[in-house]
């Protein structure tokens, strides 16, 4: 479909995002977890989702590996495909925000421009960049998927942090120390959500 096909007309919903938020009892936002492989993004995002669920918050977690089994199964790891991967996830996250959900995404998303692209799509005030800052040496020691070992052996090319750049956020809404206990990081995130009147429980 052409980007501006004149036969494709935007359909306005009778139920507004604000009405959906009122129904859920909280605001719809995206928490965009970014960091190196092994930094703890998925672990912290999963623990936060569990905590929010217990508080009665409507959530959904989009994980970098999971979406490549379906939504982005046709994409590889070239720069163009990686950008398209993030674009698609951003669109899905935006739809979920409009549905009034608290959306958690766990993606390396190494480039600032791509994260900014999603921020602009979702809109200021609804996009929370979460930088899980864990030293490369710690990430490599953890190596939960064995990817650093493969990258060091030359079996995996263009691996972020080894032979492909990671552009750390310059002004993330929250900067987490990935060496801290997960429970501490989850509490910091819950505090942020409450301080910004996103959740009330």
Curated annotation (Swiss-Prot):
Alphabetical keyword list: ATP-binding, Kinase, Nucleotide-binding, Phosphoprotein, Transferase
Any GO BP: sulfate assimilation
Active site feature: 109
UniProt cross-references to Gene3D superfamilies, sorted A to Z: P-loop containing nucleotide triphosphate hydrolases (3.40.50.300)
Binding of ATP, residues: 35-42
Reaction equations catalysed: adenosine 5'-phosphosulfate + ATP = 3'-phosphoadenylyl sulfate + ADP + H(+)
Pfam families: APS_kinase
GO molecular function, one term: adenylylsulfate kinase activity
Pathway this chain belongs to: Sulfur metabolism; hydrogen sulfide biosynthesis; sulfite from sulfate: step 2/3
InterPro entries: APS_kinase, P-loop_NTPase
EC number, UniProt record: 2.7.1.25
Region Disordered, residue ranges: 1-23
Function: Catalyzes the synthesis of activated sulfate.
Family under the similarity heading: Belongs to the APS kinase family.
Protein name per Swiss-Prot or TrEMBL: Adenylyl-sulfate kinase
Source organism of this protein record: Escherichia coli O6:H1 (strain CFT073 / ATCC 700928 / UPEC)
Phylogenetic lineage: Bacteria, Pseudomonadati, Pseudomonadota, Gammaproteobacteria, Enterobacterales
């Amino acid at each position: 479909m052409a980007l501006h096909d004149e036969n494709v007309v935007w359909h306005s919903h009778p139920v507004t995002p604000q009405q959906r938020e009122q129904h859920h009892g909280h605001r719809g936002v995206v928490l965009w977890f970014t960091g190196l492989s092994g930094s703890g993004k998925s672990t912290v995002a999963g623990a936060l989702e569990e905590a929010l669920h217990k508080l009665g918050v409507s959530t959904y977690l989009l994980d970098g590996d999971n979406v490549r089994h379906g939504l982005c199964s046709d994409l590889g790891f070239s720069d163009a495909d990686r950008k398209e991967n993030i674009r698609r996830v951003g669109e899905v996250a935006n739809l979920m925000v409009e549905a009034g959900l608290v959306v958690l995404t766990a993606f390396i998303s190494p480039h600032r421009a791509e994260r900014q692209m999603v921020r602009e799509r979702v809109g200021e005030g609804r996009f929370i960049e979460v930088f899980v800052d864990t030293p490369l040496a710690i990430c490599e020691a953890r190596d939960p998927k064995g990817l650093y070992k493969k990258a060091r052996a030359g079996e995996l090319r263009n691996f972020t942090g080894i032979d492909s750049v990671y552009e750390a956020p310059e002004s993330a809404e929250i900067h987490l120390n990935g060496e801290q206990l997960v429970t501490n990081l989850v509490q910091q995130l819950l505090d942020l959500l409450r301080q910004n009147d996103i959740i009330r429980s």
